[in-house]
């Protein structure tokens, strides 16, 4: 299934790719970029931009800053997750801190989820 996207976001998506957070950069270069399952950075899906997306596993990987743990951020994340789930996309969320301090554990969880979704 082809996912909807907002073509008006293209310049913003390019900007996000050039200006990744430290956590996003670490995860991308240390694990996702060399991963045998192809990931896309800053994937536009409908009104949202996913930090990382693996089409073969229909998996979104989100790296969350502190604003995601405030009530408004949690409500927005819940709406975003529900929207993505309607397209069969599973969302994995990690904090910036998790990625920076436990990259190996984060990578293991991503790999476990990919294998579970592809070979279900």
Residue ranges and their predicted role:
Residues 1-120:
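Nucleic-acid endo/exonuclease domains
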């Amino acid at each position: 299934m082809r996912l909807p996207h907002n073509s008006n976001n293209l310049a913003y998506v390019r900007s996000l790719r050039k200006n990744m957070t430290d956590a996003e950069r670490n995860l991308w270069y240390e694990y996702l970029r060399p991963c045998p399952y192809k990931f896309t950075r800053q994937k536009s899906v409908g009104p949202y931009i996913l930090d990382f997306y693996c089409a073969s596993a229909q998996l979104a990987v989100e790296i969350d800053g502190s604003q995601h743990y405030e009530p408004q951020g949690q409500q927005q994340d819940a709406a975003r997750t529900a929207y993505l789930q309607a397209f069969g996309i599973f969302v994995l969320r990690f904090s910036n801190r998790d990625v920076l301090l436990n990259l190996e554990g984060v990578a293991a969880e991503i790999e476990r989820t990919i294998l579970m979704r592809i070979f279900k």
